[in-house]
Amino acid sequence: LVLTQHKYSAILLLVSTFGGLVLNGVLKLGFNRPRPAIFLPEVHTVSSSFPSGHAMNAAIVYGTVAYLAARLHKRLWARALVMTAALIVIVLICVSRLYLGVHYPSDVIAGVAIGLAWAGFCMATLEAIQKFGARRDPKILEQEKPAPGGPPV
């Protein structure tokens, strides 16, 4: 992203991803919920169960990447395709956490909800900075301008 002059997009991806990792660690320490008693013997875990880090990080990373990719597409079908692909990956990761028995369903649901909330906050912050920022570089803003019709809903 930096090499293609999408500086703000690169910053958004970094802040949302690493901020999400920190947020997940703080929440795991705060709740310290034990994992389910029954899970596959070859699965080794070292952290607490709530919230699911995999689900949370999947929602953050794939949600943010889908948002950034959809901003660049002009056609509605392309935006829908990007969002659908991200949703499928997130759901598959969530199902894998339940299949392996390393999380309760509430851990996974909370992980996705918190991840989407954090990613949404980061995306809204990017939009506000680009719209109202005092130090705006016109060249960068033009390159990162959303496709006509605004960001996907």
Where are these regions (language model features)?
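Membrane-embedded catalytic cores of phosphoryl/pyrophosphoryl-handling enzymes
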Residues: 37-153
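Hydrophobic alpha-helical bundle signature of multipass membrane enzymes
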Residues: 1-48, 64-71, 82-84
